Amino acid sequence: MSDVERTEFEIPGGIPPRRNGGQGRAADTNVDANLKPDEYDAEVTLRPKSLTEFIGQPKVRDQLSLVLTGAKNRGVVPDHVLLSGPPGLGKTTMAMIIAQELGTSLRMTSGPALERAGDLAAMLSNLMEGDVLFIDEIHRIARPAEEMLYMAMEDFRIDVIVGKGPGATSIPLEIPPFTLVGATTRSGMLTGPLRDRFGFTAQMEFYDVPDLTKVVKRTAKILDVGIDNDAAVEIASRSRGTPRIANRLLRRVRDFAEVHADGHITMGAANAALIVFDVDEVGLDRLDRAVLDALIRGHGGGPVGVNTLAVAVGEEPGTVEEVCEPYLVRAGMIARTGRGRVATAAAWRHLGLEPPEGTIGDY
């Protein structure tokens, strides 16, 4: 029997055991949905180029198709578009597709990069008619730039201030009609005036396993990697409903299959690789389990404040709150209460422990 047919693999040094505790760094996790700097080039090659090629998000795709087709038929630029949702679900890809579908150029920037009104004015003055301007993390745009954006979105003009003090003058500058696509992971942080200027808003949802399986298979085809269906399902089921994580895990499993087998990804190769990279059967990694361990073994299941949990696992509070906690809450393993975070019965059982009587979710 060849290595690729086995369900067990011999790895130099052995497969590291899963630990329910221990420390983890956000930069090392394979299940952080934020884009890592060294992943940009890989992501570009994997992005779909059209709405029909885009997998998942059927409601958003159908709505956007209507908006774009209607605008093209009328010969006008589409309304400004706001895409909301957690990282890794395809907001940037959707902005690229919008420009592709319209046959126009895409200009990209981010909210944190627009610190002054002049930064935004420079970008707007270089737009051509019909261009798509994509602002990622638009909720982080500086107030002076945001106020300039109001007029640009509504009237396609801006006022440029020349000079300082009493001698300063305002020069109106017409800009070509354009479509702004804003992306945000925190739509609640958008000001009302900015949110109201978007003609179309869409909420990107987490993916189910069937759609994520399609994503894994499509990526494997692009990467020229053979993969069995059950292996694709296994990778998808551990990807937290997020295509970016699914693609990252597939690349790690590919590495394993190339080193320890013949490069073809079987169920055995997928399982063994995900053990090596410390991603368990429900998508938790070492840091997630360390948080649960600190909450349950260290504090009896809570309630515990996020700062205390962060100290216990050796992480920054922001990392625990933004990287770990959202998925643990969505997976039903942590509940937020007025007094702090509380472990649910599912969390106790995930660590192989019996939950005390009265634990949340213990029916």
Curated annotation (Swiss-Prot):
One Gene Ontology biological process: DNA recombination
Segments of this protein annotated with the region Head domain (RuvB-H): 281-363
Cellular component terms (Gene Ontology): cytoplasm; Holliday junction resolvase complex
Main localisation: cytoplasm
Residues binding Mg(2+), per UniProt: 92
SMART domains from the UniProt entry: AAA (SM00382)
Residue sites binding ATP per the record: 46-47, 88, 91-93, 154-156, 197, 207, 244
Class in the EC hierarchy, top level: hydrolase
UniProt region (Disordered), positions on chain: 1-32
Entry GO MF terms: ATP binding; ATP hydrolysis activity; four-way junction DNA binding; four-way junction helicase activity
InterPro entries: AAA+_ATPase (IPR003593), AAA_lid_4 (IPR041445), DNA_helicase_Holl-junc_RuvB (IPR004605), P-loop_NTPase (IPR027417), RuvB-like_N (IPR008824), RuvB_C (IPR008823), WH-like_DNA-bd_sf (IPR036388), WH_DNA-bd_sf (IPR036390)
E.C. number(s) listed in UniProt: 3.6.4.-
SUPFAM superfamilies listed in its UniProt record: P-loop containing nucleoside triphosphate hydrolases, Winged helix' DNA-binding domain
Keyword Coiled coil: no
Residue positions binding DNA: 336, 341
Reactions it catalyzes: ATP + H2O = ADP + phosphate + H(+)
UniProt keywords, alphabetically: ATP-binding, Cytoplasm, DNA damage, DNA recombination, DNA repair, DNA-binding, Hydrolase, Nucleotide-binding
Record region (Small ATPAse domain (RuvB-S)): 208-278
Subcellular location: Cytoplasm
CDD domains recorded: AAA
NCBIfam families from the UniProt entry: PRK00080.1 (NF000868), ruvB (TIGR00635)
Record's subunit section: Homohexamer. Forms an RuvA(8)-RuvB(12)-Holliday junction (HJ) complex. HJ DNA is sandwiched between 2 RuvA tetramers; dsDNA enters through RuvA and exits via RuvB. An RuvB hexamer assembles on each DNA strand where it exits the tetramer. Each RuvB hexamer is contacted by two RuvA subunits (via domain III) on 2 adjacent RuvB subunits; this complex drives branch migration. In the full resolvosome a probable DNA-RuvA(4)-RuvB(12)-RuvC(2) complex forms which resolves the HJ.
Family: Belongs to the RuvB family.
Main function: The RuvA-RuvB-RuvC complex processes Holliday junction (HJ) DNA during genetic recombination and DNA repair, while the RuvA-RuvB complex plays an important role in the rescue of blocked DNA replication forks via replication fork reversal (RFR). RuvA specifically binds to HJ cruciform DNA, conferring on it an open structure. The RuvB hexamer acts as an ATP-dependent pump, pulling dsDNA into and through the RuvAB complex. RuvB forms 2 homohexamers on either side of HJ DNA bound by 1 or 2 RuvA tetramers; 4 subunits per hexamer contact DNA at a time.
UniProt-recorded name of the protein: Holliday junction branch migration complex subunit RuvB
